[in-house]
Structures are given as C-alpha cells and as structure tokens.
C-alpha cells in the first residue's frame, strides 16, 4: 500500500490533518489508529456527564502508569490517554480552554518559533471552532469543533463559586478564551448542540470519511517508522488482535500524531532518540536526538471538597435509580444533566504578583467526586479542582524494549521543584479564602478534604503528596525549537531527517495555562496549512489583556474564616 501521507494516530491532531489534507482531491492519506471506532451509541464516550467512565477501563484508555514518583510518596500515578478514533478528545473532560495569550507569546520568543505568537495562533483557534452563540474577534462560527457555552438556569453553585472568587479579590471574566483569561467566569465545553461529545472524530473525521482519498484503518498498532537512509518512507504496524505485521509506504511524508506519551515511544523504536538508550536496547540508530522523550510536562491538581447545606448539588445524579431518567432525557432530547460535562465555571489567577500571567487554574464542580469517578462523597457537596500551570518540574519517557505492546517507562518527576510546593500551598490557602466568601454562605458546609485539621506547611505537603493527581495534560516530550534538546522545528519537521513530522501536544515547547485539547487542535490546523503549502492565515489584530503592574488581587470582601468556624 502506498499513499502520499501516512498519519499515525487518529486523535485530536491526527484527525485534523486527515480532514484538511484530504480537502485536496489529488492527495491520498492513510490514517492509522491503534484503538477502535468511536461507537456513537456508547454513552460512556458520547454522554458528556459520563466522562469518568472511559477512564475506568481499557477499551478507550491506554491506562498508562508512571514509575514510582519520588516526590509523591513513590506512588505509581495514573496517566490515562485516549485510544480509538478521536484519541484523547474521545475521553477527555471536554473543557474548551485555549491557554493564555502569554503562553504563545512566550513560545514565539524562542529561536525558530517566531510565528507562534498569540496573534499568529488566534486565527487557527477561530478556524477550528463553531461557538453556539456566534463568532467574534476571538471565536469562530464555521469550524468543525462544536463549542457550547453555559446556559441560564444551570446549577446555582457555578454562579456562587464565581461570585466567591470575585469577592476574594480576583477579577471576573466573561470569556476564559477571550480578551482576558485571568479571573473567574463561565467555562465553555466541546459539546454539540444535541448534547453529544464533540470529539475530533465527530467534528473532523465525519467531514472527511466520505472522501475516497482517505483510508482509515483501526486496530493498527504502529511498530516503527521505516527509513531509507535519513528519509522516512513508511510505517510498519500490527493489525488486529493477532498482531499481523503490515507495511504501508508514504510518497511524501509520515505524520506522527501519537500524543505526548506515544510519539516519543514510536520515534525511539524507530531509531530516533537518545543514542545511549537506543544502543542499550539494540535499536539501530537513524538520528541521535537527545530530546526525544525529555522535557515531559503535565498539570497536577488537587480536589478541595465541601459538603453542601442545600440539596442543589449533583449528588442525586450519582444514585443508580436516578440515572435511567437522566439517560433517557439525554438520549432523546440532548438536554439535562447528561448533556453537560459539569465543568461550567472556573478561572485562572496569579497566586502572587511576581507571576506575569496566571499560574493557578480552577475547575468548579457541583459534586464531590474524583475525576475518574472514584471516591464519590455520599452526600450533597461541591469541590474546586486546583493546580499549578507551569511547573518547573520536568520528566521523561523511555521505551523499555522494541515491543510496541509494552508500555514505556514514564516519570513526570512531579513536585521536584521548591516552586511547586510554594504554589500548591498557596493554592490550598487561597481556595479556602474563596470558599469562605459570602456568596457561598448559603451552601458551604464542612470541609471534607483536606479537612480542618490540615493547616501548617507540613500537613499541607503531606496531603499534596498523597492526594494530588494528574489533570491528564501530558505534553512537551518532543518539543519544537532549534536548541540541542529540540526534536522538531516550528513546522513539526523532525530535526536531522526528511519526510517526518510530529504534530500533537508533544511538540509544545512549554505547557500552556489550561487544558490542552483546543491548543492541540490549533497546532494541527496551523501545521496542516504548512504541509499543504497554503498561505498562513493572516495574523489577528485583536487586543488582549496583559497584566503588567496590575495587582494579582484586591482586598477580599471577607478575610478568611478559620476553617473550623465555617457556618
């Protein structure tokens, strides 16, 4: 089999490339996906409120685990990644957050990445998006990704938590993806007008499937990329449960879109990576690139949980006897509790004035439960997910063998910097100040987690080590740039070889301030134009907020109550 392009991975980036490249009728594309179809009748992936279910099994989740994390009580920590058409957009939390403008301006300050400024990227965010309330300078109206905004009549806890953040002295913003990300406000979600998950399989692949120049093969596990000298010429993959070896050839390019965990694995198995590692595993060296699998970054977060004095939380939706009614309303009407991911409010703040742009993110949830659906509190409650955005900690990914079925060695090295500890302690204390504000007086009960007895630095640190979890945002493991640890250039082309690009979250040079999915889609849209030889979209001239000397917060309405005195 021979095609112009072979795309490895039908995820958030791969599906964008498949759709955009096949817009050119004279181009043939093979899309390889290790997982299966995105079954549209499977509520576990299609119902927004069921977002925890795919993380509990292995049909849609690679279910990686880290090596023992040395600063986290040597815990082996979850590292869920999507498997199936849609990739991680098939199992993520559907939060539509793009990052802060300053993230992209920081990228553009690095050598070789000058065209990755916020105003260069904004047109591609807009190109990808259809927002339900219409386009403006920041939002699109004709893109494949359906974005839904929170609606009047949603849970009162969302409004109370935003109001509490403002009363604590932080800004309010009406659009976390608009002029000013900093502050508290409503959170958009990647959900269709009919209440279905808006994965890239639904948004992009559905447009491309009817084209006869696109071939999609599922249950195709990539073994390695093939080379003639320094040129990528094809892909060796294993088909189906039997693992039958198959080979496909690329006339133009191989496009690796495996994500921040799989892409460095595939490069290393293919002979591109740290020379010493490949030599140890008897993998023939094609190109020594020491940065492959290095610079690994993620967001770590904690849950601060509270009981709710009024029966307005989503606790009843967790009870089995209420779930059939919720499911029926969602299935036939696309409305109700099932049609929302329930992350409809959040925010970004600077924990200290020294930060140039927000370093802490909040997701507010009107129920007390772990992200993966475990450890639900058996009473009315609510919680704040809070974590730092740009940790100095860096990890790595290394293959253990040539076998593509074997999971790699993953180490994020969470909380390895003193800055991490300062930020997480600040985050807990600031969250308690927010929860103590008058807006939450009608709802606030006791603090369930960490609990009123967790107060000093040592107690907070012990809680963080034992309870902080991944936000499922691995990135930066094949970073773009032109320094000695860069893996790709600003167009995703792998250094030192020809005919091979990496296009996914792994090529971010530094993790962004927020959830990764929207930015991963933007990256693929932008590089797709480069691959096709199209003129880049014109830079935006939209104004955007820069904090400058603006204080991180003003005086709160209520100075923090002692945790034990919460009414």
UniProtKB/Swiss-Prot annotation:
Keyword Repressor: no
GO biological process: glycine betaine biosynthetic process from choline
Involved pathway(s): Amine and polyamine biosynthesis; betaine biosynthesis via choline pathway; betaine aldehyde from choline (cytochrome c reductase route): step 1/1
Sites where the protein binds FAD: 4-33
Keywords from the named record: FAD, Flavoprotein, NAD, Oxidoreductase
Free-text function comment from the UniProt entry: Involved in the biosynthesis of the osmoprotectant glycine betaine. Catalyzes the oxidation of choline to betaine aldehyde and betaine aldehyde to glycine betaine at the same rate.
Entry EC no(s): 1.1.99.1, 1.2.1.8
UniProt GO molecular function: betaine-aldehyde dehydrogenase (NAD+) activity; choline dehydrogenase activity; flavin adenine dinucleotide binding
Family indicated by similarity: Belongs to the GMC oxidoreductase family.
The protein's name: Oxygen-dependent choline dehydrogenase
InterPro entries according to UniProt: BetA, FAD/NAD-bd_sf, GMC_OxRdtase, GMC_OxRdtase_N, GMC_OxRtase_C
Gene field: betA
GO cellular component: membrane
Catalytic activity from the UniProt record: choline + A = betaine aldehyde + AH2; betaine aldehyde + NAD(+) + H2O = glycine betaine + NADH + 2 H(+)
Required co-factors: FAD
Disulfide bond annotation, renumbered to this chain: none
Catalytic residues, chain numbering: 473 (proton acceptor)
One Pfam family it belongs to: GMC_oxred_N
Source species: Yersinia pestis (strain Pestoides F)
């Amino acid at each position: 089999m021979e095609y112009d392009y072979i795309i490895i991975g039908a995820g958030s980036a791969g599906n964008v490339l498949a759709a955009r490249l096949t817009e050119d009728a004279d181009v043939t594309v093979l899309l390889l996906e290790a997982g299966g179809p995105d079954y549209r009748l499977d509520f576990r992936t299609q119902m927004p409120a069921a977002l925890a279910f795919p993380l509990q099994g292995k049909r849609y989740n690679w279910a990686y685990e880290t090596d023992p994390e040395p600063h986290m009580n040597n815990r082996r920590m979850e590292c869920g990644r999507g498997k199936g058409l849609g990739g991680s957009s098939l199992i993520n939390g559907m939060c539509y957050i793009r990052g802060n403008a300053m993230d992209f301006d920081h990228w553009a300050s690095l050598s070789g990445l000058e065209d990755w400024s916020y105003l260069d990227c904004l047109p591609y965010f807009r190109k990808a998006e259809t927002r339900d309330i219409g386009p403006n300078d920041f939002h699109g109206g004709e893109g494949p990704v359906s974005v839904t905004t929170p609606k009047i009549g949603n849970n009162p806890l969302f409004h109370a938590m935003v109001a509490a953040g403002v009363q604590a002295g932080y800004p309010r913003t009406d659009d976390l993806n608009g002029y000013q990300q900093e502050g508290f406000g409503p959170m958009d979600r990647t959900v269709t007008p009919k209440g279905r998950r808006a994965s890239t399989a639904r948004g992009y692949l559905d447009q491309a499937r009817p084209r006869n120049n696109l071939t999609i093969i599922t249950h195709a596990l990539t073994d390695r990329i093939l080379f003639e000298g320094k040129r990528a010429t094809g892909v060796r993959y294993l088909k189906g449960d039997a693992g039958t070896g198959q080979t496909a050839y690329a006339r133009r390019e191989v496009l690796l879109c495996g994500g921040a965990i799989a892409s460095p694995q595939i490069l290393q198995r293919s002979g591109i990576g740290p020379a010493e590692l490949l030599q140890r595993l008897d993998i023939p060296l094609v190109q020594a690139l020491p940065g492959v699998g290095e610079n690994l970054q993620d967001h770590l977060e904690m849950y601060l949980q509270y009981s709710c004095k009024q029966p307005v939380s989503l606790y009843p939706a967790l009870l089995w006897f209420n779930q059939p009614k919720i499911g029926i309303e969602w299935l036939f009407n696309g409305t109700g509790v099932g049609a929302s991911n329930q992350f409809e409010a959040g925010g970004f703040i600077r924990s200290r004035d020294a930060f140039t742009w927000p370093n802490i993110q909040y997701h507010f949830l009107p129920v007390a439960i772990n992200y993966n659906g475990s450890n639900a509190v058996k009473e009315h409650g609510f919680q704040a997910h809070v974590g730092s955005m740009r940790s100095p900690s860096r990890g790595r990914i290394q293959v253990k063998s040539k076998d593509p079925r074997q999971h790699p060695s993953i180490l994020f090295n969470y909380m390895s910097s003193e800055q991490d500890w300062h930020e997480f302690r600040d985050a807990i204390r600031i969250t308690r100040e927010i929860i103590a504000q008058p807006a939450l007086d009608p709802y606030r009960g006791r603090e369930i987690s960490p609990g009123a007895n967790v107060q000093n630095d040592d107690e907070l640190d012990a809680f963080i080590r034992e309870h902080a979890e991944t936000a499922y945002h691995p990135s930066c493991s094949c970073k773009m740039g032109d320094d000695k640890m860069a893996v790709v250039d600003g167009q995703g082309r792998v250094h030192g070889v020809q005919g091979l690009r990496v296009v996914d979250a792994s090529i971010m040079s530094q993790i962004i301030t927020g959830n990764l999915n929207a930015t991963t889609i933007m990256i693929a849209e932008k590089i797709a134009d480069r691959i096709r030889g199209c003129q880049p979209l014109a830079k935006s001239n939209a104004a955007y907020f820069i904090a400058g000397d603006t204080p991180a917060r003003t005086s709160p309405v209520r100075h923090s109550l002692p945790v034990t005195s919460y009414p």
